[in-house]
């Protein structure tokens, strides 16, 4: 063989042997990401920073497609193999995605990093049966109290807030005929309501303890609230009038600032008192997570894990807050000056300590919860004793359990 030709072959072989992890041996050198449209450009910019900081993975082709959290989860459940390598999803889809084998569980090392970096509730939202399956991105979906500080002198108790609103002729808004907001009372007293699903999303079992002393205490608190002259059923500050205080979320922070002006203030949800016992209001919390699809190529998996770690890091979570307003789950990012100055996010972060990550619930549950709340608002239980309220809750509980299995 010609010596020059041999030299070319050998040099080519040597070059191939030192190629970066995306080498031609990989089955696929494209990494596909699904993110909400609002963060597509941001994510593309961060990937460029990732490649610059991680030259070993710069040779992969990174493709970012705009797919919302709900659609991303549904698409993965439909066809895992055709799905994105990394995708955003809401925590209520975790169990289904795990059952469908659509998520790569974190290694012990990665689990340690995720747990160390992020707040306890977001880590819990990414965990199933003691296994961490995703990288938390946010702790920013839930509800808390917006109030007019010229009206409400102390937002720590529901009784005090109502008294201040009544005295000022102002309204207190909370949507107690919503199964989402209603849990603020029931979970506060220790009542439980949750469901298990299979990979197809079918509800297989239910854990409901509303028919209990805890449930009766929660229902009595709702009845007392509805009796207040300040009470208004609602959760959208844009649709509210003459507001002294409202239970709402970060999505309405702009409208709240416009409404309250210099008197704009926020706080965690208050306590309420039933029969001499104080309960801290609870409720549902929501978290955005970043999942990795199982990979057959270990080099590509390493790249995906490095990218997930980068996109969920302190620096990127702060940048994402500044670009899109997403509230960080990263504990250090939560202490960032700009994040700390956001009083709505600060109030929500405090409230999420008392909230429960929302799982999946049957559509019929939401309808049933609305009916219960409507009966409270309508005064149907105003004269009911504890035994009668327990019967109401037993019927509610039996109906909810019947939605599973």
Labelled PLM ranges:
Residues 4-13, 17-93, 398-405:
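Conserved N-terminal structural module of periplasmic/extracytoplasmic solute-binding proteins
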Residues 65-75, 229-240:
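Short helix-initiation/N-cap motifs at beta->coil->alpha
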Residues 260-323:
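Extracytoplasmic/periplasmic substrate-recognition and gating elements
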